[in-house]
Amino acid sequence: MAHRMGTNRSALINQILADYTSVVTPERRIENIFHEIEQLVAPARDLVPFFAPHTTSMSLKSSLEYKYRPTVKYEVALYGDKQEGLGELAVIFRTQSAQLLQSMTQFFRLWKRIEDAHLSGVEPDYALYDGKFVRTLSLPPDHDYTSEEIARAISDYVQLFDRLMKAYLAGKYTPPEIEALYCAQQQQRAAILI
């Protein structure tokens, strides 16, 4: 039975006990968040979500408006332990175009500068590797967020990042305009990722 459900016996027993006692396990909460993200991004069709049950990560794929339509994969990994933070977002891209690679790197650096200037509280950690931009995800500690609120915050953030990155790469917005759009979106959001 555990094998059919894509898990092991120990995890299955834990889940059965949690269901029986009406306790939401960290694993179930992560799965609920991913289901909610899937529902939130599906109508826009800019991001294609994918996640497998009983995993702590999901991916969202997006196509760039560029010569050969390269894809960007957003990988959201959530931690079960709140003390480690919420999780991390990795933006993974593969391209042979030196120009596109340079433009994406410039955007990632711009994004970090914007967040450094406008986020208060816990500062996220960033890393930029060949073909990968990583950012930690946290929520302000002043509130116990529901799965729906967390999913909304993550989906809003990824959609904003994707929309502004595509616009930047297409030359539609200058860095000051990207910053203004970022700030306007931050003011509208109920839960702000930090």
Locations of regions flagged by a protein language model:
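Short, positively charged interaction helices/loops
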Residues: 22-55
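Short amphipathic alpha-helix starts
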Residues: 1-2, 17
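Short, surface-exposed, polar/charged, turn-prone segments marking secondary-structure boundaries
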Residues: 15-17, 40-42, 119-120
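Terminal, compositionally biased segments
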Residues: 3, 7, 25, 188-194
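Charged, low-complexity intrinsically disordered regulatory/assembly segments
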Residues: 94-194
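Amphipathic, interaction-prone secondary-structure segments
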Residues: 48-101
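Short, basic amphipathic alpha-helical segments that act as recognition/interaction helices
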Residues: 7-30
